[in-house]
């Protein structure tokens, strides 16, 4: 199944010059969404994660569906101030500024094997920071999975060396 048929291109969103790859038609289509999750399940069969970690916010959609299908737990990586209780955080730089991501301090304290997921790998800044946060929190990063990768933006190069990456749809 060609998953690209379910991705809508939105020019000039969120600002002029940007071509946004919208996965909401994919989420709406039961057959397309099922195919996404089954392909990611196959990835997990190779990498054998104990937990799925998803990056805010569309990584929650991908990650919870995958975790449910696998019978695994799910852990969210969130923007600052969104998680109650004790957190571990990481600050990272963006093209035009900086940001912070957080995870519960005890979420990975038992050193599980983790698959990090999100809907999109673009420049790699958020994914790279999330990967570092997984390690900082005690997890062993066994792989990264994305629905879409914008290869022209070279985000894959920012991810930890030696960690396998699987993207279901690659543009550029």
Curated annotation (Swiss-Prot):
Superkingdom as given in the UniProt entry: Bacteria
- List the keywords (alphabetical): Cytoplasm, Glycosyltransferase, Purine salvage, Transferase
Q: Name one GO cellular component term.
A: cytoplasm
Query: Which reaction equations make up its catalytic activity?
Result: AMP + diphosphate = 5-phospho-alpha-D-ribose 1-diphosphate + adenine
Subcellular localization: Cytoplasm
MF GO annotations: adenine binding; adenine phosphoribosyltransferase activity; AMP binding
GO BP terms in the entry: adenine salvage; AMP salvage; purine ribonucleoside salvage
Q: Which Gene3D superfamilies match?
A: 3.40.50.2020
- Tell me where the signal peptide lies: none
Q: What class of enzyme is it?
A: transferase
The protein's annotated pathway: Purine metabolism; AMP biosynthesis via salvage pathway; AMP from adenine: step 1/1
Subunit-structure text: Homodimer.
Could you tell me which NCBIfam families the record lists for this protein? apt (TIGR01090), PRK02304.1-3 (NF002634), PRK02304.1-5 (NF002636)
Q: What does this protein do?
A: Catalyzes a salvage reaction resulting in the formation of AMP, that is energically less costly than de novo synthesis.
Give the family from UniProt: Belongs to the purine/pyrimidine phosphoribosyltransferase family.
- Name of the protein in its database record: Adenine phosphoribosyltransferase
Q: Which organism is it from?
A: Synechococcus sp. (strain WH7803)
